[in-house]
Amino acid sequence: MGGTISMRRSRSTGDLRQRLLRARGETYERLLGEVEDGSSQSLGELDKGLSSLSCEGQKYNQEQYMNTPWRNPAEEREKLAYRKQNMDDIDEEDDDLVGDTVRPKVPLRTMSYKLAIDMSHFIKEKGGLEGIYYSARRHRILDIYLEKEEGIIPDWQDYTSGPGIRYPKTFGWLWKLVPVNVSDEAQEDEEHYLMHPAQTSQWDDPWGEVPAWKFDPTLAYTYEAYVRYPEEFGSKSGLSEEEVRRRLTARGLLNMADKKETR
């Protein structure tokens, strides 16, 4: 039985890479997490357990967090029930992204630290994401794939906002987004496009960068997103509201959010 499951996973993961490579591009959307959501939260909602944490030089492990330091088990159960109730409402277009129905083959569950690590290594072993350019559509394909094959509720995939390396906000997910240099010739070359279709360009990215997935095993030991950019976690960071806004403003993220709201 184990061999059968392994063979099925191997085939399906190989299909994932091909579907990601074939995915048509879309304008870069803010699937990286809306910074205004974090910055607008009241400090009164701050978890007391986080108030004593320092965000400098700390390492995190699965004993400290379920996955991220603000997961609420009751809320997660509600999400799980909601997903089960609304599974039939998923768009047909989403079905096409993975080439099959997105009805999960296993019971639905939330992403955990251990599960994120297991899925990261499994996808790496099958060559799933390495070097593939990030796009909103590919983000969605990965969500649907793990929902269908592993029953993982697609609320886990989120990255820091950039510029530069975008670190996963889900502790245990070992794939970060790294800006790569793509020459004009490579972007215009038909063969390169077919082999590595850069479905997101520097014109789609708010920072003018072309991010690609890269495996980083050290993310299993250090919660880089939280250590480097605590302000992106809003009131959950332990920072004062003023400090959160100051840091977001210094990085140009609040201005970016304001421009989006006025469009």
UniProtKB/Swiss-Prot annotation:
Q: Which InterPro entries match?
A: HIV-1_Nef_core_sf, HIV_Nef
Superkingdom per UniProt: Viruses
Q: Where in the cell is the protein located?
A: Host cell membrane
Q: Where is this region: Acidic?
A: 88-96
Query: Domain comment?
Result: The N-terminal domain is composed of the N-myristoyl glycine and of a cluster of positively charged amino acids. It is required for inner plasma membrane targeting of Nef.
> What functional role does this protein have?
Seems to play a role in optimizing the host cell environment for viral replication without causing cell death by apoptosis. Enhances virus infectivity and pathogenicity. Probably involved in viral immune evasion mechanisms.
UniProt protein name: Protein Nef
Q: Which organism is it from?
A: Simian immunodeficiency virus (isolate 1A11) (SIV-mac)
Gene designation per UniProt: nef
